[in-house]
Every structure is written in structure tokens, then in C-alpha cells.
Amino acid sequence: MIDVNNFHYMKIGLASPEKIRSWSFGEVKKPETINYRTLKPEKDGLFCERIFGPTKDWECSCGKYKRVRYKGMVCDRCGVEVTKSKVRRERMGHIELAAPVSHIWYFKGIPSRMGLLLDMSPRALEEVIYFASYVVVDPGPTGLEKKTLLSEAEFRDYYDKYPGQFVAKMGAEGIKDLLEEIDLDEELKLLRDELESATGQRLTRAIKRLEVVESFRNSGNKPSWMILDVLPIIPPEIRPMAQLDGGRFATSDLNDLYRRVINRNNRLKRLLDLGAPGIIVQNEKRMLQEAVDALIDNGRRGRPVTGPGNRPLKSLSHMLKGKQGRFRQNLLGKRVDYSGRSVIAVGPSLKMYQCGLPKEMALELFKPFVMKELVQREIATNIKNAKSKIERMDDEVWDVLEEVIREHPVLLNRAPTLHRLGIQAFEPTLVEGRAIRLHPLVTTAYNADFDGDQMAVHVPLSKEAQAEARMLMLAAQNILNPKDGKPVVTPSQDMVLGNYYLTLERKDAVNTGAIFNNTNEVLKAYANGFVHLHTRIGVHASSFNNPTFTEEQNKKILATSVGKIIFNEIIPDSFAYINEPTQENLERKTPNRNFIDPTTLGEGGLKEYFENEELIEPFNKKFLGNIIAEVFNRFSITDTSMMLDRMKDLGFKFSSKAGITVGVADIVVLPDKQQILDEHEKLVDRITKQFNRGLITEEERYNAVVEIWTDAKDQIQGELMQSLDKTNPIFMMSDSGARGNASNFTQLAGMRGLMAAPSGKIIELPITSSFREGLTVLEYFISTHGARKGLADTALKTADSGYLTRRLVDVAQDVIVREEDCGTDRGLLVSDIKEGTEMIEPFIERIEGRYSKETIRHPETDEIIIRPDELITPEIAKKITDAGIEQMYIRSAFTCNARHGVCEKCYGKNLATGEKVEVGEAVGTIAAQSIGEPGTQLTMRTFHTGGVAGSDITQGLPRIQEIFEARNPKGQAVITEIEGVVEDIKLAKDRQQEIVVKGANETRSYLASGTSRIIVEIGQPVQRGEVLTEGSIEPKNYLSVAGLNATESYLLKEVQK
């Protein structure tokens, strides 16, 4: 037997009958398993000790020989070899079949290998193998062709005419004879000749046959081995039988399947010995064939064999197949050593690169390291002693543990791991309790929250693994999201709220307009309660020593607030002083308007100046993200992660000080809500009257009503937001981006608005109450549809999205950066991606980080901005767009010439690091994960364009699947194949609409269904490939009409939506 742990590769192929017999340790002749009284295996049965080895170590069946000293002896009474019982995992048996049987994989698989080799259809094969027809093996003088099928009656006729002069057989025997006659070399020659002359269907078939014939010839397997004469039986330990508590037995399904084969085989042998009538023998042979089929692949043909409770039995193929099969479950999905899992809790005091490990868990995970260290330090005398010390948890163990885990990173993983940020490395610190502590800023990357989520810990053992974890996977290194290059570690919730509150300004704050010499004075004044965080003050600009201030600015007073001074202490020194949430302040310097010349102040001093000035907006979540991105671009990763930690601490500190909470009193109801509702109610009445008088259709009435109520909700929302106090806690939460949005607030204080029915159609009766007032029973009932659909969708979506990701990774995993430059002369023309007026992805974002394909000059000054094959940095991208250029050719993976994968220049920069991409980077997998990861957030619903109107247009996750599978989309759009002018739009028969396009040389008309919305007008010029109706374009048509580049761009745009 091969050594399980020591082999280089595995070859899978056909086994000859001799090979099967050589594996076997004996023939299984009886279907019995074990004796129910003695509980010993039956002799010659499926668990026989003589064939498969002893059930107890070093002991024969009858008990004559016990002990190791008889190793290798064969007992003369029971015939069992004295050896280890482990051999029952590797010794195989066999069954000598009384009639040849076809192997279902080779006959039923797609394409049927047997069918291709014999040039017979799978249908014909099935008729022969399952004893419905005869096949001619040797035609003799009959004038029949070899491989012709004959029915029972036809066979009789020929047999009467030509007795004993021709051979026709039924069942696998006939097929075996035909397979034995095949001369592979001859067949190969004939097929090669056919390839040269054949066309169409015959050519494809010849190619497929050639593949099979060549494979057989190269592998040295004989075609006739696809028919089994001997059936191997896998070792008994792999199909175990165990006794349950009640004296019953639980057994592997394979035993049942083997039992049926043995029973039928024995019966067939007996019938043959008795010389039974042909028809009975035929029936038995067919049943044997079906039993073997069920054993190899149950359910592949006909109804599956079922066990108790109508459950299909698990055959050999099912053991290997699918997610629960041997490959994906046990070989690719092993459980690993040195790992643990626990609930996560937030660790606000941790540094970016740290995580908290519970003491008990750390001790168990690092046990061997601790034991070695204990022995080295001579705290323990030997390993055994060290082990007992650890188990007792002696005091000295903890000191050693702290030493051991220092600088030894661990990996934290949260399932589902949707992208590479689902596993990151941290340096462990020991914590009390039993929960793993997680740094609050990495929660976004893991998509984790602290409502009971669990995470797994893994310990990298080797020095290489530790180095890799530290260099590549440390959380402090993974600040950018690989899918778009934006920071993924932005503060959230409390941290955002704290920083927002800190940078807020108020008109009525205490001692507004006080002027200070330097920041230390400000902090002292704040500590003593002289000024508030929100107080607007002046500070002498020169005292900041800020390198970005101009000489002019240094002579003036900087108008700022106490909170902003505290906030700016966390920003690196050489950065501009951030006084207002604008890109200008971030990228260049603090704007001049924030500096005041003290000589120009009037009688009331700075206070009077502030009274006439507008308040500056506080810093919200988006702006904090911009600060992080800017710091990351200009400083090192270390500086960025240190600043992130300081921002986090600041946020937590001041959100605690602010004590922002939500109470019922914070929800202020709009006084003139009823008036707005009444106005819109009148509008609805008017529409209903028009409908009753037959002036408008049902569809128009429905759409108008929906529009009226949507407008009512928008109006209420607008007025609510206007009337809200800027320091209202709920407003602060939504404005800062910490939690909630305007719509949530409208539902609390204004009205809930329109709801969707289970079908997705919008119910035209709105919910006019808000949560503050309380819903009526009917309103509550209507709103439960949405909630329930939400839950059902989420469950289905997760599985679909995961499956899509899996298929995408499968396809894209070989796309690796293989070379520096493929030298292509083609490029891709890029510009803004827009849908109507809505911007999906602006031009500047599409070119940044890519390589240019052409020289770009400034249209006015004619200076060269960039040359071909140069990287477009953010600065250059800004120059290009500032120059008014709206499109350009860039290097793209679409046009890359690399034989396998892509090249560095066509790919552009690595978004996860912001550096240029290196050869060997698995960019295909990154792309697949970047599409798959947001998949879970996409909506599942088929969006109805206002219910009745228009046809359904798929959106969200199903649309993404449609694109990648190149299916014909639902709600297909009509496109024009010629360039010209829309001449006419009219009704055609069957309630269809006809659009006539007149070109220079020809006129074409297109039919659209009666419900589609036409988006062109009479007299409008259209280009080739332009869309005439709403909907999604079918990619295959578009390819033939508009060409490759247009189709690539269209698919790209659709995915980005």
C-alpha cells in the first residue's frame, strides 16, 4: 500500500480487471455484514476478517493467536492474518461479476466517452446496455452494418434466415466485444483524414472523437476496461457499521448498495448454473447492471435507490461530489491546528496593529512555545513538567506567555470572508475575560459588529509565515480597500459623532471672540471653563509655527474654534491647519478668509466680527475619510495608522463628553404637516375625477397618485430638515454620518410614506402617520410586507452572492500580472460613465492610477501633460481634467497583449497599496472579490418601473449575474443596426409598437412590445447600436452591431451601476 504521507502525485485512470484483482485480498461472496448475536464479521461477507484483516490489533478471529509476537502469522483455524487492525482501512476486496457490466460514468457522462469511441449515440448505447435491443457485432453474410441495432423481432427474423452465421448481442457483453475490436491507431488515421474534409457538425464531432481516441492511445488504457468484469470493494473502515444504543445498527449507505450487487450477482450465477430461460437471465443481468450503476452513481439514470424514509442512498460518486464531498469538504476545507474562536468585543484602547486575546485561549494556542521557554529558563525540569505547570496555570507561566506572544502576530478571521480584508494579522495582547478584543477601526473591513459576532484566531508557526503576516497582513498595512483604493478604516458611529461635536461652532457659546496668544493658553482656558469647545476664538497665527502659513498669514489672527485647535493636534505637523471641511483647505493651505488683520477690527472686536460671519460646518464622516486619504498619500503608513488611533481616541473621548442621546422629546413633529397632506389629498381627488370621466388611463392615474404622495413626503422632509435645530441630537447623528439619514428622521417625525406590496408594486395608499404619532392597525399591516420581504431577501441574497463570487474567482484566478509591458499598440478610450444625467464614475477617477496610451497636451498652452506609457498620478489626472480634456486613450486590461494574464502597464497601480502593481500579483482574484463582496449589499428585487408601466428591468444582484453569464436579459432593449433618423413610431399588429429608422441607403423597422417605453422621438438622429427602448441590451447582438470596444464599454458601465 502507498504511504499516505509520502507521495508526489496521484494518477487517476481506468483499472484493468487484472489490476483490480491484484489490489484485492479476496473475493466477497456473501451479502452478510456481521452476525447479530456474536457481533463478529461473517465469513466471506462484506466485513470478513479473512479478507480485510483482524478487527482487533494482533489478534485473529477465533482468538487462537493473541499478542504481537505472532505478527504476520495466518491462523490455521480461521485463516485470519495476525496484524494491526489499521489494515482494515487499506485492504480492498472484489466481486467476480457473473456478466460484464458497463461503468455508468463512461456511458452516461457528458459527452459519453463510450458513445464517442464507438461512434454510437448514447440513446442507442442505453438500449443495448439495458437489454432493449441487440447490437450487431459481426454481420456475416446478412448485409447488415456493424453496430446496427435490432429489435427482438428483427433479431429473430435474421436468426431464422442466417442461423449461426452472424453475431448480435445484448447488454454490456455486446458493447465489450465492440470495444475490444477497436484499433486505436487505425481509428486515429481515419479521424485525421476526416478532419481535413469535414465541415460543420461533422467536424465538431470528429474533433471530440479525436480527443477521446488520442487520450486512450496516450494513456495506454484499453477501451474495453470501461466495461467491468470485476468490481472492487473499498476497505470496510471506510464504509463502517456501528452499533447504536438501542441495539440497532447504523451503517454506511455503501454497504446497502454493495449488498444489492452481491445478491443479484449470486442469483445470476445460480440461474446460469441452472440453465434458466434466456428472458429470466436477461432480466437478472439488467438488474445487476442497475445495481452496479446505483453503487457507482446513484440517481444518474432512472430513479435513485432509496433507503428508509425515501432518502436516496449516497453512492461512491456522491462521496466525492459537491460542497460536502471529499474534495471540497476534507481536502480543501481542513480544520487546522493552533486555532480558536470566541465572541468579539470592542477594544477602544488598542493600537491599530493590536488585538486582545483572552488569557486562557492564548495559553492554549501558544502552549508548545511556552513549554519550550519554561524548560529553557529552567523554570521546569523537562517538557512533561512544563506541561503540568501550564495545566495548573502556575503564576510563572503568565510571565513567560507574555514574553512568547510579544512580536508573534496572530491572524483574525471573520466568516464570511468575502474579500482579502476578511483575514488580517494583529499583535496579541493578553486580556481578562473570554472575549477577543477587536480594534474599532477594522470593523468596517470585517463587516463586524459587537452584537455577538464570533471570530477565529490562527497562529502562524514558521518564521516565514510570521514574517508574511507582519509585512503583508498586519492591520496597520491594510488601510486601503483593494476594490477602489479608498481608505477602508474610516471612523464610524461614536468616533464620527465625537469629532463632529468637537468641531461644531455655536453663535451663543461662552466668551465668543476671545483672542489668545497661543494654543496652550486656549487649552488652559478650556480646562478652567472660560471657553467652551464650540466657542469661536482668535489665536495669533505665528504661534502655530505651521510651515504652510504664508508670511502674510503669520502676521494675522487665525479665526477658529476651541474644538478645532484640539482636533488639529492629531494631524501631522507639516500638514495644513484644518479649519473648514473643504478640499482646498486639505490639499493646499488654510484659506486666507480665515485670517483676520487685527487692525481692521471695529469697536466690538472679534466678537462683533463673528456675529456677522456664518458658522463653518463641522467635520462629517466623509470629510474625515478625505483627511485620512490625504494623510495616506503624503505620509507613511505608520504615520497614518498613528493618526487614525489618535482620531479614534479623540472621537470616543468627546462623544462621551457630549453625552449625545436620543429621547422622544428630540423628535419634533412638524406643525403644518396636516395642511400639506390636505393639499395633496385634493390633488389625488382631482386625478380620480379625471379618471372617472375617462380623461386618463388607469396606468396614468396610478403613476400620478404615486408621484403626488412621493412629492408630499419630499415636501415634509424638506420642511422638517429646515425647521430642525442644528444641535438636535438626531440631526447631529445623521448629518455627521454616524447613524441614520434624513429619510429615517422623516419616518420618525413626518410621515412614513408609500410602501411596496409583496409583489414589489407600490401601494398607492400612503402611511400618513409617523412613528412618533403611532401607526393605525391598517398602516402597521401594510408596512409589515416590507419588513418580511427584507428578511427573506437577505437570506437568499447571501447564498446567491457567495455562489457568484465563487464562479467569478474560478474564472479569474489565472489572471496574474505576468510581465512589465506587453507592448500593445491599442488602448481604451475613456470618459465619464453616465446614466442619463446621473454620474456613475467620473473621468478623473477612471484615469487616475492608469497608464496613458497617448501624448496629452494642454489645449491652450500646448505643453505636454503626459507622454504614452506614463503613470497618471492624482496630480496629473487633475491637470488633465482642469485643462478641459474629457476623454483620452489609456492602457487597459481589455487591450492587453500578454499571453497569459495581464502586464503591469495595462493594469495600472495596485489600489490596495497605492504603489505600482508588481509581477506576480493575483489581480484576477482581487477583481472577483471586489465584485463579489458588495454583492451581498445589492438588492434582490426585480425593480418595477412604477408598477404597471414599462416592462420589468432586472437590477441589483440578478442583473450582475445576467451580465457575467451573458444571458439574454429580461426586459431586453431594442437597438438600431443602422445610423439614421427616426422616421415614424406607430402601433403595429398584436398591440406591438413599430419604430422606423431611415438611414442613408436603407430603411429598417423595429418591433417593440406594447408595454415597453420608447425613449426616442420622431426626427431624432440615432447612431448604430443606439437604444430605442428602455431596458438592457443583449450583449451578443450589440457585439455584431456596434463592435468589440462599444460592447466592452457597455458591459463595464452596466457592472459599475
From Swiss-Prot:
<feature type="binding site">
    <location>
        <position position="449"/>
    </location>
    <ligand>
        <name>Mg(2+)</name>
    </ligand>
</feature>
<feature type="binding site">
    <location>
        <position position="75"/>
    </location>
    <ligand>
        <name>Zn(2+) 1</name>
    </ligand>
</feature>
<dbReference type="Pfam" id="PF05000">
    <property type="entry name" value="RNA_pol_Rpb1_4"/>
</dbReference>
<feature type="binding site">
    <location>
        <position position="78"/>
    </location>
    <ligand>
        <name>Zn(2+) 1</name>
    </ligand>
</feature>
<dbReference type="InterPro" id="IPR038120">
    <property type="entry name" value="Rpb1_funnel_sf"/>
</dbReference>
<dbReference type="InterPro" id="IPR007081">
    <property type="entry name" value="RNA_pol_Rpb1_5"/>
</dbReference>
<dbReference type="Pfam" id="PF04998">
    <property type="entry name" value="RNA_pol_Rpb1_5"/>
</dbReference>
<dbReference type="GO" id="GO:0003677">
    <property type="term" value="F:DNA binding"/>
</dbReference>
<keyword id="KW-0804">Transcription</keyword>
<feature type="binding site">
    <location>
        <position position="822"/>
    </location>
    <ligand>
        <name>Zn(2+) 2</name>
    </ligand>
</feature>
<dbReference type="InterPro" id="IPR000722">
    <property type="entry name" value="RNA_pol_asu"/>
</dbReference>
<keyword id="KW-0460">Magnesium</keyword>
<dbReference type="Pfam" id="PF00623">
    <property type="entry name" value="RNA_pol_Rpb1_2"/>
</dbReference>
<dbReference type="InterPro" id="IPR012754">
    <property type="entry name" value="DNA-dir_RpoC_beta_prime_bact"/>
</dbReference>
<comment type="subunit">
    <text>The RNAP catalytic core consists of 2 alpha, 1 beta, 1 beta' and 1 omega subunit. When a sigma factor is associated with the core the holoenzyme is formed, which can initiate transcription.</text>
</comment>
<dbReference type="InterPro" id="IPR042102">
    <property type="entry name" value="RNA_pol_Rpb1_3_sf"/>
</dbReference>
<dbReference type="GO" id="GO:0003899">
    <property type="term" value="F:DNA-directed RNA polymerase activity"/>
</dbReference>
<feature type="binding site">
    <location>
        <position position="453"/>
    </location>
    <ligand>
        <name>Mg(2+)</name>
    </ligand>
</feature>
<dbReference type="GO" id="GO:0000428">
    <property type="term" value="C:DNA-directed RNA polymerase complex"/>
</dbReference>
<dbReference type="InterPro" id="IPR007083">
    <property type="entry name" value="RNA_pol_Rpb1_4"/>
</dbReference>
<dbReference type="Pfam" id="PF04997">
    <property type="entry name" value="RNA_pol_Rpb1_1"/>
</dbReference>
<comment type="similarity">
    <text>Belongs to the RNA polymerase beta' chain family.</text>
</comment>
<comment type="function">
    <text>DNA-dependent RNA polymerase catalyzes the transcription of DNA into RNA using the four ribonucleoside triphosphates as substrates.</text>
</comment>
<keyword id="KW-0808">Transferase</keyword>
<feature type="binding site">
    <location>
        <position position="60"/>
    </location>
    <ligand>
        <name>Zn(2+) 1</name>
    </ligand>
</feature>
<feature type="binding site">
    <location>
        <position position="896"/>
    </location>
    <ligand>
        <name>Zn(2+) 2</name>
    </ligand>
</feature>
<keyword id="KW-0240">DNA-directed RNA polymerase</keyword>
<feature type="binding site">
    <location>
        <position position="451"/>
    </location>
    <ligand>
        <name>Mg(2+)</name>
    </ligand>
</feature>
<feature type="binding site">
    <location>
        <position position="906"/>
    </location>
    <ligand>
        <name>Zn(2+) 2</name>
    </ligand>
</feature>
<feature type="binding site">
    <location>
        <position position="903"/>
    </location>
    <ligand>
        <name>Zn(2+) 2</name>
    </ligand>
</feature>
<dbReference type="InterPro" id="IPR006592">
    <property type="entry name" value="RNA_pol_N"/>
</dbReference>
<dbReference type="GO" id="GO:0006351">
    <property type="term" value="P:DNA-templated transcription"/>
</dbReference>
<dbReference type="InterPro" id="IPR007080">
    <property type="entry name" value="RNA_pol_Rpb1_1"/>
</dbReference>
<dbReference type="InterPro" id="IPR044893">
    <property type="entry name" value="RNA_pol_Rpb1_clamp_domain"/>
</dbReference>
<dbReference type="Pfam" id="PF04983">
    <property type="entry name" value="RNA_pol_Rpb1_3"/>
</dbReference>
<dbReference type="GO" id="GO:0046872">
    <property type="term" value="F:metal ion binding"/>
</dbReference>
<dbReference type="InterPro" id="IPR007066">
    <property type="entry name" value="RNA_pol_Rpb1_3"/>
</dbReference>
<keyword id="KW-0862">Zinc</keyword>
<feature type="binding site">
    <location>
        <position position="62"/>
    </location>
    <ligand>
        <name>Zn(2+) 1</name>
    </ligand>
</feature>
<dbReference type="InterPro" id="IPR045867">
    <property type="entry name" value="DNA-dir_RpoC_beta_prime"/>
</dbReference>
<keyword id="KW-0479">Metal-binding</keyword>
<protein>
    <recommendedName>
        <fullName>DNA-directed RNA polymerase subunit beta'</fullName>
        <ecNumber>2.7.7.6</ecNumber>
    </recommendedName>
</protein>
